[in-house]
Amino acid sequence: MSAAASPRSLTLIGAGLAGCLLAILLSRRGWQITLYERRGDPRIKGYESGRSINLALAERGRHALRQACAEDAVMAKAVMMRGRMIHPVSGEPQLQRYGRDDSEVIWSIHRAALNVTLLDLAEQAGARVHFYRRLHTVDFDAGYARFIDDRDDQPHEIHFQALVGSDGAGSALRAAMQRKAPVGEHIAFLDHSYKELEIPPRADGGFRIERNALHIWPRGRYMCIALPNDGGTFTVTLFLPNEGMPSFATTRSGDEALALFARDFPDALPLIPQLKEHWEEHPPGLLGTLTRERWHLDGRAVLLGDAAHAMVPFHGQGMNCAFEDCVALAEQLDAHSDLSEAFAAFEAARRDDAAAIQQMALENYLEMRDRVGDAQFLLQRALEQQLQARWPTRFVPHYTMVTFLRTRYAIALARSEIQREILLEATHGHTDLSRIDWVALETVVHARLEPLEGAH
């Protein structure tokens, strides 16, 4: 379709987090936005997402929400997390702060609460939302799309100018684009899966464990995490290998899950009274990384968020990255009247950064499950904090760049690799920081790391 036919009209597939945020951003710019969602209205029917892992909202995501005038409404439902609360098999939990103080924190928010908030704001901005519309087929040449209402199998056909795929990792639009022209899709599944559980609130409605932290029970090849909700509950997620001992293959029944928690997560077990029932009710979820050689089909379709570059959840950046995508696409639509140019420029602007955070998310899993209790890791963390205190604009911790700043992911990855080398070399053979050669370190830091924009 020619961009001149209806230059300010887009059809969005998927009314999840990214779809709703993009709808707000573009509706506020004067675009006519229509969203089609395969599920029912969550405000009426209740939330039906295939996954409910809590989301970690960082500065990137908050910046995108500010662009849409949505930050205040979202933050009212978020819970602050100061750091990781590490739970050993025995002994007291220890807090590892994310940043220097409470200005450097992340926020936990329940996916359903966030989706409903953004959905309300999208409609208020003027977007139209159609529920029970599962994308079935697309005729890209004629500009027609057919949807099916799964309640009665009735078809619904529409005419479109261009489609935006914000329909997640299992994107139906991506599949339709693949049928039209191969897009070089590759999915690498992790050899681990996850299962969701819940810590209920106390009888008085309060939190059973520290509310302002992301709780981690690291156990080497596997781990359990818990993120707070604003209603006093915690969403618990167990990440476990698919095979081996222990694994989902060896922990099938609720009784086997009880035995696993009694042995490896003894302080978590009494917090999850419905462990057995939830274990048997909730199937394991898959974890994977999606890459594609092309995110758009000239000016007729484009993908963003998980539909373009799904990642494992271990850096808490999937949503934040998708929200950055929304802002980037809106900016390219501002800059280019031709949709094919806008979509191509969007992909060019975001491809390297998406690949970088996908890599960092995989690396963070190893850190969370294997290293957070390791003495050498803790020594490197201590040195990292000292280097940041001495040269705050040059030595900026990895987590700070990714989470508290909006440093491009690709730049954060490149700098993090240099900083990791510096930390490894400086701590080699040491058990504490008393014999660190600070003069030599200053020379290395200034030689290898330029000042970073935004660091302070």
Swiss-Prot record:
Keyword Cytoplasm belongs to the record: no
GO molecular function: FAD binding; kynurenine 3-monooxygenase activity
The reaction(s) this protein catalyses: L-kynurenine + NADPH + O2 + H(+) = 3-hydroxy-L-kynurenine + NADP(+) + H2O
Protein family (similarity comment): Belongs to the aromatic-ring hydroxylase family. KMO subfamily.
Pfam family, one: FAD_binding_3
EC number(s) reported in the record: 1.14.13.9
InterPro entries the record matches: FAD-bd, FAD/NAD-bd_sf, Kynurenine_monooxygenase
Recorded metabolic or biological pathway in which this protein acts: Cofactor biosynthesis; NAD(+) biosynthesis; quinolinate from L-kynurenine: step 1/3
GO biological process, one term: quinolinate biosynthetic process
Described function: Catalyzes the hydroxylation of L-kynurenine (L-Kyn) to form 3-hydroxy-L-kynurenine (L-3OHKyn). Required for synthesis of quinolinic acid.
Listed cofactors: FAD
Organism (species): Xanthomonas campestris pv. campestris (strain B100)
Alphabetic keyword roster: FAD, Flavoprotein, Monooxygenase, NADP, Oxidoreductase, Pyridine nucleotide biosynthesis
Name used for this protein in its record: Kynurenine 3-monooxygenase
